[in-house]
Amino acid sequence: MIDTLAVKSEPCGQNRFSIVWSWHKNNTKNPIGGSFYVTVDSSVTEDAGALAEMRAIYYLLEEAHVHGANRLGNGICIEQSFGAIRKSLLKKSLKTSGLGKTQKAQIANAAEFLATKYFGAVVTVNAKPKEMTFKSYVESDIELKQDYPRAELPCTLIGADIAISRHALYRQVARIDQKITHPNLLDDLSDVPDARFEAGWVWLRRILASDKLQEMQVRKGSAHKTPQQYASARYLHFADSEVPAVVVIDEDASGWVAKTVLRADQAQFLDWPAYVVGQRLVPARIFERHRQNKDRS
């Protein structure tokens, strides 16, 4: 059986909305539900209602946990009022471009947590929700500031939470889960089952909490120039994986963000420990280059 989270907004002032919500466990006819007010930042001049519903969905899933602790999107239907939200989360488009179909950037940004942690959820438009009797009813009051809330995972190594970008999750699916190595094939994940994206989230949750995660430094004098967007990044290496990986994190105004996930063999610009060969130490980059050449011969 599928569970349904439904939200409906009504304007009740300048960038202020009344939200009525319900949670139907196994599509019960007597759901739990409630209402609250969402105040959207005054800088928002368009799509305030859609952003208010996104903030409401985030609150219900990430703060109130109406669906249960540690649950992802599989088996959940999210009913809301705006076509732009649904378009921003179309699975086929997400799997081929990393973006949905919507042209509204702020809605796509606000939907980041649904495109990552809750990838498996089904998002629909329900402009005319049914009248219902609630099993229980809760009221509260929240606000949406300029920074959209993000789904985060705790990282033991750095002692902070890390937001997971959709690019990082999708690169984990492509490079680590699906073992895709050809650059031209990384962006087309249309044949990958939805479940693998949620498995990617679980993988990130596991390795970021692992005591086997190690931070690596960029090798001094490295000829490899890291991409500009990762110039101030930190590199977290996890070797205990079928495909050893490096999670690239950076800090923005809201905190730490996982920007991408690399295979360890892509990160030769890092200062890897030397290998012992016979009676001498061989720099890791030279050892790996020799091994790759030997494999090709």
Provide a role label for each language-model segment.
Residues 57, 64-136, 141:
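RNase H catalytic domain
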